[in-house]
Amino acid sequence: FSKYFGVTGWRLGTVLLHEKNVFDDQIQKLQACEKEELEKRYTSLGTHATDVKFIDRMVADSRLVALNHTAGLSTPQQVQMALFSGFALLDEGDRYKKLTRRICKKRKGLLYEGMKREMEKDPHDAYYYTEVNLYEWMQKEWGPEVATAMNRRYKCVDFLYELAHQHNVILLAGDGFASSKWSVRVSLANLEEGAYLRIGRAMYQVLQQWAREVKKLS
């Protein structure tokens, strides 16, 4: 649901615990001072907070403990997710999925057009996000020597700062998503098509400015 229907954060998960489990056993073995802390934290759940099951504590900790009565999955969310599921089952031709992919693919194409690059072809690409390796781009566009000089003089965080400062464009560093230190992540999910052309152009202009500066110093 999170990505497919544009409800980021609406993820479903399941936790199963045996009625007799090691977590509850360890809670009962805690020292008196530690149990007192638990009593304070979970006092709103009942008069004997130290007897609250570990799995119930997890539910309570999903938001403020005092709001335990509304913790977990809310009824409106359950209804909405049921509607999403029903819609997906009825859409036998995957028209929604195909339309969404076409829209995101076009946005990615405009992004690469702005970067003055040919869009990479990947049959498994969902087009929801795209990651751009800036160092590889620098090598192809301005050559290995200039790219090496840019790598010595700047960091990816400098690129993100200049992009925001000069062009009001906010991107995320890719290394937080298990990518390279010179990669940036662009979401293709929520902006108008023309915005991606402008983002690509802004990215190109920042790197082009860097290339000119390092060439002057060489």
Model-inferred region functions:
Residues F1-S218:
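PLP-dependent class I/II
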